[in-house]
Amino acid sequence: MKVALLGAAGGIGQTLALLLKLRLPVGTDLALYDISPVTPGIAVDISHIPTSVSAVGYSGEDPSEALKGANLVIITAGVARKPGMTRADLFNINADIVKNLVEKVAEVCPKACIGIVTNPVNTLVPIAAEVLRKAGVYDKRKLFGVTTLDVVRAKTFTSELKEKHVETVKVPVIGGHSGPTILPLLSQALSEGLPLSFTQEEIEALTYRIQNAGTEVVEAKAGGGSATLSMAESGARFAVAVFKALLGEDCVRYAYVESKEGSGYPEFFAHPVRFGLTGVEELLPIGKLSEYEQAKLGELKPVLEADIALGKNFVNP
């Protein structure tokens, strides 16, 4: 079984490559690809770490060698956010990069699952879907946007606010993966399986912080980058869990995937997902929303729908 990481020389990619080398199951092949000539060296560097995961690096314009035989492709390639940039500003550059990479996936390993980390996820996942459709290989079970960082942040910030042990806290996060489209369901937040209670002021402040945590990091790094380390850790959590699901382990994670037709949600939406041998096996119920969450859902839908339309129109002008 093989994982291909596209964008392996970037700020997220290098750390994610290290974490995958440490955490993927014994015997996994890890292929690292980036346009940068340092990529084979990154593979050599992590190959000195004593785990039973083999790493090989590829550089240049063509990722085909890295993609051959891949079961799971993780895409982190693209430019990072800088101060003053929104995720939408990234679109013009990253849309082309992801489109070209997904075209290669469609050609070389059309049955592989694809996890997109590159922002703006809301728009790039629909681009990938359209590219795969055009190639005649689209399978909605095998394409997902990685929104794990939103769940990780919700868990961390909630545990800090409520002074609970972070490992005991669970907070669902649905919607999209940009500012106002990120919707933490604090009404369903649990610690040690028991509901947590919040004042309205806490709900609003915590929701705002989770939605804008990416900007918090960009500003704190003072022009020196975006959230690379927490994103790499979140990406590793997701990739390893999904890869193990492809091997038969039970796995439920939140991810930005194609919604059920007639569900009332936008065409792509972050749901709780059961992953299995074929990728997405089941979209699980989102559960009951509070009045505040229902209002927020109503606000985010048109924003997310516009993001999705932007992606589809990019491939089909």
From Swiss-Prot:
EC number(s) given by UniProt: 1.1.1.37
GO CC annotation, single: cytoplasm
Ligand binding (substrate): R81, R87, N119, R153
Binding site for NAD(+): G7, A8, A9, G10, G11, I12, G13, D34, N94, V117, T118, N119, M231
Keyword Transferase appears in the UniProt entry: no
Database matches in SUPFAM superfamilies: LDH C-terminal domain-like, NAD(P)-binding Rossmann-fold domains
Catalysed transformations (reactions): (S)-malate + NAD(+) = oxaloacetate + NADH + H(+)
Keywords for the protein's UniProt record, in alphabetical order: NAD, Oxidoreductase, Tricarboxylic acid cycle
GO molecular-function term, one example from the UniProt record: L-malate dehydrogenase (NAD+) activity
Active site positions, chain numbering: H177
Enzyme class at the top of the EC tree: oxidoreductase
Any one biological process term the GO annotation gives: carboxylic acid metabolic process
Keyword Cell cycle attributed: no
Annotated family: Belongs to the LDH/MDH superfamily. MDH type 1 family.
Subunit structure, as described in the record: Homodimer.
Functional summary from the UniProt entry: Catalyzes the reversible oxidation of malate to oxaloacetate.
HAMAP family: Malate_dehydrog_1
This protein's name: Malate dehydrogenase
